[in-house]
Amino acid sequence: MPDARQPAADEFSEIERLFRPLTGGVAGAFDLLDDAAVVPQRLGFDLVITKDAIVGGVHFPEGERPDLIARKLVRVNLSDLAAKAAEPFGCFLAVAWPGAFGPADRAGFAAGLGEDLRSFGMALLGGDTVSTPGPFTASLTALGWVPEGAMVRRAGAKAGDIVAVSGTVGDGGLGLAAVRGEIEDADGWLVGRYRLPTPRLDLRDILRGEASAAADVSDGLVADAGHIARASGLRLSLDLDRLPLSAPAVRWLAAQPDRGMALVRLATSGDDYEVIATFAGSVPAGFVRIGEVSTGAGVEVSAAGRDVPVARGGWRHL
């Protein structure tokens, strides 16, 4: 875990003080004193592993509170586990501290990390800390259990299935716009949705029992629908007039001159961390029908009663 380029005593003592308590005493973490951790097998279960990274100025604004950075890191990873119907239990952390990230900032990050790990029943099993001349960068590898063979993949949709999404769509993108001062957010609700998303772990049993395919909505609803379409070898048709919207999103939409393109913006802005899934038959509680699956390829989108071209389905890093 330590970076050899840093004073060993300082870093080891900081790991012991800030991060060792986050192991929760799990035996396989070895108090963060070893080169690796051990994850014992669990009879009748598959181990699900995911990894996401966040970078300052890309995934959160410069000057963000360190505890909120850590909590968002946990939650974006748990969103992947939620979409796979997995139950989280542990994680590995890699973090690159910039020079401006002082002892108080590192302590704040560790406090936020610990808060959410405890809330979601997870233990820190290991990781690495380094320094960087660039922006703050961190990644989390999250682990979860799912009954053997029960992970819900992107590949699994069938022609005739219903496409549905959980929660509300577009709040994360509007929250980012509010952070940038582009729109008003008087009560801070949209900004809260962007800064601290809620992973939909509550949908685990529904997804295991009823979903044929699923993905978390992180890049943008249209982009993530495209991931399912590609993996399943089928076409997903989305009717954006069916999008479930929050009250702030409804108010924003009503003020836009082109409803169709405004709906496209909501469906492509990302950072919602909801779940898009396909179902054979009725739509379960917690989801709203927004389209259907058919033979073909890609994603077709309609909004405001007309077909609309979508040049970019969501966020892309490259």
Give short role names for the model-derived ranges:
Residues 141-152, 159, 185-206:
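Active-site glycine-rich loop that binds ribose-phosphate moieties when present
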Residues 47, 54, 89-178:
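Glycine-rich anion-binding loops of enzyme active sites
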Residues 173-190:
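Short, compositionally biased
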Residues 1-68, 93, 112-117, 121:
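Extreme N-terminal cap/leader segments of soluble proteins
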Residues 158-167, 196-221:
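Internal active-site segments that recognize and position negatively charged phosphoryl groups
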Residues 1-21, 98-125, 131-138, 143, ...:
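Glycine-/charge-enriched secondary-structure boundary and capping motifs
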Residues 66-90, 111-119, 206, 220-231:
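Small-aliphatic-rich amphipathic alpha-helix that forms the alpha element of a beta-alpha
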